[in-house]
């Protein structure tokens, strides 16, 4: 089995909108960096899958569909083999 890991910092910039509250909130500091993390694995027969997790409140289905389509286009692995999830944090930035 082959596996690969990746992470990308998605910590909101100071002053950026923080969704998930009834009133408007802006990022005023960083306690812990936020990230999008990915794990991709394949076995000896070539079967592959990928797990992607975002430190965000949610992920719009249109965004995950675009990510799956890009994954499929770049790797040749069906987009259905990619799972997208979130940590549902109320301290992350907006997801576009």
Regions found by a protein language model. Give the residues of each.
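Conserved beta-alpha junction segments in alpha/beta enzyme cores
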Residues: 1-96
């Amino acid at each position: 089995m082959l596996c690969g890991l990746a992470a990308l910092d998605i910590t909101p910039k100071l002053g950026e909108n923080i969704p998930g509250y009834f009133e408007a909130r802006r990022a005023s500091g960083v306690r812990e960096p936020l990230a999008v993390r990915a794990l991709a694995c394949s076995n000896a027969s070539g079967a592959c899958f990928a797990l992607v997790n975002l430190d965000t409140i949610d992920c719009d289905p249109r965004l995950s569909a675009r990510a799956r389509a890009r994954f499929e286009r770049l790797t040749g692995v069906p987009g259905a083999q990619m799972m997208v999830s979130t940590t549902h944090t109320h301290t992350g930035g907006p997801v576009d």
